[in-house]
Amino acid sequence: RAQTRFVGVLEVQKYFAFLVMDSKFLANDIFIPTDELNGAGNGDKVLVEIVEWPEKANNPVGKVIDVLGKPGDNTTEMHAILAQYGLPYRYPGDVEKAAELIPEKIDEKEIALREDFRDVFTITIDPKDAKDFDDALSLRKISPTLWEVGVHIADVTHYVRQGDVIDKEAENRATSIYLVDRTIPMLPERLSNGLCSLRPKEDKLCFSVIFELNEYAEIKKSRIVRTVINSDSRLTYEEAQTVIETGKGDFSSEILVMNSLAQKLREKRFANGAINFERYEVKFNLDEKGKPLGVYFKESKEANHLIEEFMLLANRTVAEFIGKVPKGKHAKAFVYRIHDIPDSEKLDTLNAFILRFGHKIKTEGNKVEVAKSINSLLDKVQGRPEENLVETIAIRTMSKAVYSTKNVGHYGLAFDYYTHFTSPIRRYPDMMVHRLLERYLDGGRSVDQTELEMECKHSSDMEQVAANAERDSIKYKQVEFMADKIGKVYDGVVSGITEWGIYVEINENKCEGMIPIRELDDDFYELDEKNYRLVGRRTKREYRLGQPVSIQVAKANLERKQLDFVLA
């Protein structure tokens, strides 16, 4: 009974109303007196808060907090997902107002205090639908064998002061949320898409890490400074990728140099035992009403890796700058992004599972050896039917990456020190890191670790909640996409086994549905959890994770974001 707010559809009767909802959240409907409807009508999708749950009553009593709209309407459904997780879908007026009051023009005095990169070649590379440009890269040649690469990050904390109304809202949200068709920004849009966004041909304030690298991408020097930049161009990943592939186009010589350095950084990282999880993202082509017309997959290519490698380098450098202190000295309290070593039992389970596909990994030995054997497994399954599945189970084997003041290193990236510094427009921990960095660069004393740890925990929790909401929004679109395909037959692969049914992922569009166990009526099936399979008592027929199957789409339930399949 910890959760007090629920989303559902209102059923209004003569003297009272009920909130009817998906039972996975609460088994009992919520009783709502008619004077607590807050303008909501019969059939509306609403957010309700439980006010009391009388001792003897079956149903809790609630009141309508917000009317979301009519079920089935795209915005209503997206807001419903956010509301169900307790996430915001509107900006408080006072926060918007505070953002409007921030002056657009950068003070000349401020510019004078900073290192000026406005005449240095600088670009941003981002997804084509992005508006919040957090990061830019600059390049200049220092000598025949030496390059200077600047990683320039939007100086958000110059505009958002600790404890002000914008800051409190951002701290609470902790992250921007990327639903399937919209972004719920952590900061008001005037900041996220305007003042702080590193838009081309505009002077922008940054917090930067400047590297000197030789042609082998060995770092000769690095420094952390406040800067002012003026980006020459905003490229999409697709445009940058075309330049990398063809060697032609605007700024091709600079992009090719940066790409070559990034590739070398990447090779070194994997040689040190970083793990290469390259998952594709499922994306939808939506019409103007938000209806899904088609599914496509977004893959990471060299242009993505180019940005990724320099961001990883900057994050690592900042974490080392604060965390790496001489023996016997105490590092000041800081926010790390940590990723613990996988649990050895989980590695054994993964090993047992992949054995049936003829693969194996090292589960003992030092962490670099284990990581390398996981990489070689991920390489081997590329393009094979079990690819997605083995990757999924391998990811589940890993610990979760979280924020913490207690540094244990980052296993997946093979870094001893790592933090999040490069995305302050969309992640609050990065804003915390910017503030700590500024304080410590100025010689300030350490902040209180206990308080910082609490903020880290809040950010980790919110990151997880946002990820769940993002997943739900994709799930909703998948069900909506399949709703007019009832009766169609598809090839798929068993993606989950439970005692209530078999989950199957369709190969061509990655939509997942379930064959309820009652549909398997040729036998009585029992779950063999250890081996990820269902086994028929009589026939010994089995359904196991990773097995190819043909299914027919039987039902699409949008309200529950569920697809039901039957065997074809």
Regions found by a protein language model. Name each.
Residues 1-150, 157-202, 234, 532-534, ...:
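Charge-lined substrate channels and their catalytic hotspots, especially those that engage the 3′ end
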Residues 15-18, 147-149, 219, 291-293, ...:
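Hydrophobic residues embedded in beta-strands of well-ordered beta-sheets
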Residues 176-271:
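Conserved catalytic alpha/beta cores of large enzymes that bind or transform nucleotide phosphates
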Residues 22-25, 34, 52, 153, ...:
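A short beta-strand motif that forms part of the nucleic acid-binding face
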Residues 52-55, 70, 156-158, 215-217, ...:
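Conserved nucleotide-binding/hydrolysis micro-motifs of P-loop NTPases
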Residues 224, 237-507, 514-516, 521-532, ...:
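Append "with occasional cross-activation on large, charged helical scaffolds in nucleic-acid assemblies
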